[in-house]
Amino acid sequence: MRILLAAAECAPMIKVGGMGDVVGSLPPSLIKLGHDVRVIIPGYGKLWSLLEVSNEPVFRANTMGTDFAVYKAKHPIHNYVIYLVGHPTFDSDQIYGGENEDWRFTFFASATAEFAWNYWKPQVLHCHDWHTGMIPVWMHQDPEISTVFTIHNLKYQGPWRWKLEKMTWCPWYMHGDHTMAAAMLYADRVNAVSPTYADEIKTHEYGESLEGLLNYISGKLRGILNGIDLDEWNPAKDPVLPAKFSIKNLENRLENKKILQREMGLEVNSKKYLLGMVSRLVDQKGVDLLLQVSRRLLAYTDSQIAVLGTGDRYLESGLWQLALDYPGRFSVFLTYDDSLSRLIYGGSDAFLMPSRFEPCGISQLLAMRYGSIPIVRRVGGLVDTVLPHDPENNIGTGFCFDRFEPIDFYTSLVRSWEAFRHKDSWELLQKRAMSQEFSWQRSALEYEVMYKDVCGIKEPSPDVAEVEKFSYGQSADPSLKKV
């Protein structure tokens, strides 16, 4: 099949959240299944120097009253085709925000539609979040192009209908109060990025006022869990890690822990319990819970906490104050640094994700891959990927709590601290976490089944049987399922 993915991000070149990981990593797995998969993204300023871009555009057109050109490039790691929509509105490296954000992405969606109609016509046009939400509306009456719409984060819903009508063409048949609603109505299939999130968004608590619509379209809604690139994220080969390690030589992790402690200004002591967090510092990620429990945790235990990220000013200020009050025990770097993030994954003992909501989450997968035990709230994709630690039966991969309350989070932290003191049991827990299988293999097979379904390909796919062989997060080493 010919499949075109349209999105605002594509890792590793241009990435803010999980969408970038999906758009960057899903195509290689689909290509291995025999499909012609390409990606189209806005031509942000830095991409022209990061990628080898064609000298001449492959397509020119006019939409929304302005000219644009599409250039051809190759993904720097996986070598599949990427198309860049060239226009002055994308010259900045800023992806989101700004006064013209609504116009920029509506224009990108319109340019993508023109490109798909007139240059490279896919059988499936796979759209991601509201930025491409008008594409399913425009493609609704085209029998040759089927559309799939992926919800990465329901909270961001795009411009309202009245604003869209001032910017672009809204077909006579279009319904929906805003871009996100219209996309879900008119896409041939809709998926969320985890099975649990697909169920949650049909409820009032997580539906962001769209739960009625989501229940209405539930027949075409499903959840497909994200994966990670196991070659890119491999602690045995990661060039950033000072000490490489695997399940067979976990003792090497201690060197990373000491270097992490030194780099973040913590007391260098491998026996201390080191908690890490790499996150946008926003309410969604539960940073306010961390602020509420940190002082009590540091008073009661000998724990250390290392935080990396940027976000809301008041949360940054709270974390900064904790670092001032607890030198050597609490450290925060208010930036994003890929090398330091990998060191946190590969050197911390446990990883914090006390999220209010979490459509899928990638960080917990990376943490487990690198032997850092996730401490998570049981919500969204965290339910599907982290199994509660049961020391009596030696099963589970992390520590979980249900209510978004400080006492629940604090209890999980203390339980994990106590478990860390039992070194043999903790090492088995690390090995179970590291052996979980979260590659893109299963996700790609599930997307393939959905693509064939939406295109009306009725013959049995051999890949359907393959899907049944895998369960989310199954152990890559059967001997470690119950150690």
Swiss-Prot record:
<comment type="pathway">
    <text>Glycan biosynthesis; glycogen biosynthesis.</text>
</comment>
<dbReference type="GO" id="GO:0005978">
    <property type="term" value="P:glycogen biosynthetic process"/>
</dbReference>
<keyword id="KW-0808">Transferase</keyword>
<dbReference type="GO" id="GO:0009011">
    <property type="term" value="F:alpha-1,4-glucan glucosyltransferase (ADP-glucose donor) activity"/>
</dbReference>
<dbReference type="InterPro" id="IPR013534">
    <property type="entry name" value="Starch_synth_cat_dom"/>
</dbReference>
<dbReference type="InterPro" id="IPR001296">
    <property type="entry name" value="Glyco_trans_1"/>
</dbReference>
<dbReference type="Pfam" id="PF08323">
    <property type="entry name" value="Glyco_transf_5"/>
</dbReference>
<comment type="function">
    <text>Synthesizes alpha-1,4-glucan chains using ADP-glucose.</text>
</comment>
<dbReference type="InterPro" id="IPR011835">
    <property type="entry name" value="GS/SS"/>
</dbReference>
<dbReference type="Pfam" id="PF00534">
    <property type="entry name" value="Glycos_transf_1"/>
</dbReference>
<feature type="binding site">
    <location>
        <position position="15"/>
    </location>
    <ligand>
        <name>ADP-alpha-D-glucose</name>
    </ligand>
</feature>
<comment type="similarity">
    <text>Belongs to the glycosyltransferase 1 family. Bacterial/plant glycogen synthase subfamily.</text>
</comment>
<keyword id="KW-0320">Glycogen biosynthesis</keyword>
<keyword id="KW-0328">Glycosyltransferase</keyword>
<protein>
    <recommendedName>
        <fullName>Glycogen synthase</fullName>
        <ecNumber>2.4.1.21</ecNumber>
    </recommendedName>
</protein>
<dbReference type="GO" id="GO:0004373">
    <property type="term" value="F:alpha-1,4-glucan glucosyltransferase (UDP-glucose donor) activity"/>
</dbReference>
